[in-house]
């Protein structure tokens, strides 16, 4: 469908640009109207990350929801997967997370979960979008039917206990020194505490949010500081989350990064051995490395590919009955435990494998040699660059050059005005030349 407000992961944009108090209040009203069914009191849970604009958006959403008669339960800073879990646990009609995930503080967003903790379907988002463009004044609640709002205490402990229960009761992290980078984001309290309770020697970094430093030179999209800290502290493992903790990457004891593809391989192999895979395969996106696919073939496991976006991964998992899926970026979905990507719970599954095998992370987590993969971004101001004839011609020529030797993927980002050009294959020089040719046709140079 054509989307005016919703992208691949909710509504996202510059705070006080696209994401204004007026829009947030309207989203609260529209979503509240869509999710009010029956005569009982309806309620929504709202969590957020640590961006400065979170306060503004939170209060605007509260105004919107209460104005249509919904009660609001405010969770404060909490990981996105915790909000999804608590939506279901607290029997809410709707869950809302205020976050722009891995983006810097200037951006913010609104993503929503239904009563079972799953992200909203395209059809429901379309209903909300239609209401956003209507005058809703006549649909507001009467003065006696307005909603109430209150803050909920103790929610951090609920998530910590949930995360711990995903591990066997007898498993301890005793003897492991773990450096955890919380990206100055939503997980800054809960994840270090949970690791400590599991027995790890915890070294937390990027756990001092100030409203401006979320994802700034830290977290899963900027792991350099974590790599240095792991080497400095002679730690066994590093864990890097993003601002809302729905994605994770690992750093081994040598300071080398382990991406989402490798983590999927680790968990898939372990779960196959333990008989925990519901089907002989996993789900990943078109961005996952061909090396992962070849590794899985060696394990007699299949790889189902989807468009980019964890919502599409989950959609196929539910449709085809898989219980493991994810993205190269570190969104890992473990449907036995969660309804969305959970960076911390995914990290715990990897830690469980490390403890079970008693071997260094560098031996456990590098399962395959990734094929050379080149990804370049082209940022544009307006128009539809992919519709231009010279761009289409360059893409067609590139596909012919890589035919049988690799893959080419050119797509528009679902969250920002960027064209992503990805090529991979056995010949790095060939792949890079193909990608550079397409970026030049787009109008290069590539954005950082």
Curated annotation (Swiss-Prot):
Q: Which GO terms describe its biological process?
A: carbohydrate metabolic process; peptidoglycan biosynthetic process; UDP-N-acetylglucosamine biosynthetic process
Q: Gene3D superfamilies under this entry?
A: Alpha-D-Glucose-1,6-Bisphosphate, subunit A, domain 3, Alpha-D-phosphohexomutase, C-terminal domain
Query: What positions does UniProt annotate as the active site of this protein?
Result: 101
Lineage, top-rank taxon, reads Bacteria
Function comment: Catalyzes the conversion of glucosamine-6-phosphate to glucosamine-1-phosphate.
SUPFAM superfamilies given for it?
A: Phosphoglucomutase, C-terminal domain, Phosphoglucomutase, first 3 domains
Keywords in alphabetical order: Isomerase, Magnesium, Metal-binding, Phosphoprotein
Protein known as: Phosphoglucosamine mutase
Q: A single GO CC term, please?
A: cytosol
Organism equals Nitrobacter hamburgensis (strain DSM 10229 / NCIMB 13809 / X14)
Q: Phosphoserine: which positions carry it?
A: 101
Which sites bind Mg(2+)? 101, 242, 244, 246
Reactions catalysed: alpha-D-glucosamine 1-phosphate = D-glucosamine 6-phosphate
Q: Which GO terms describe its molecular function?
A: magnesium ion binding; phosphoglucosamine mutase activity; phosphomannomutase activity
Q: How many cofactors are bound and how?
A: Binds 1 Mg(2+) ion per subunit.
Gene transcribed to yield this protein:
glmM
Q: What is the lineage of its organism?
A: Bacteria, Pseudomonadati, Pseudomonadota, Alphaproteobacteria, Hyphomicrobiales
Cofactors per UniProt?
Answer: Mg(2+)
Return the EC number.
Answer: 5.4.2.10
Keyword Isomerase set for record: yes
Family, per the entry? Belongs to the phosphohexose mutase family.
CDD domains, per this entry? GlmM (cd05802)
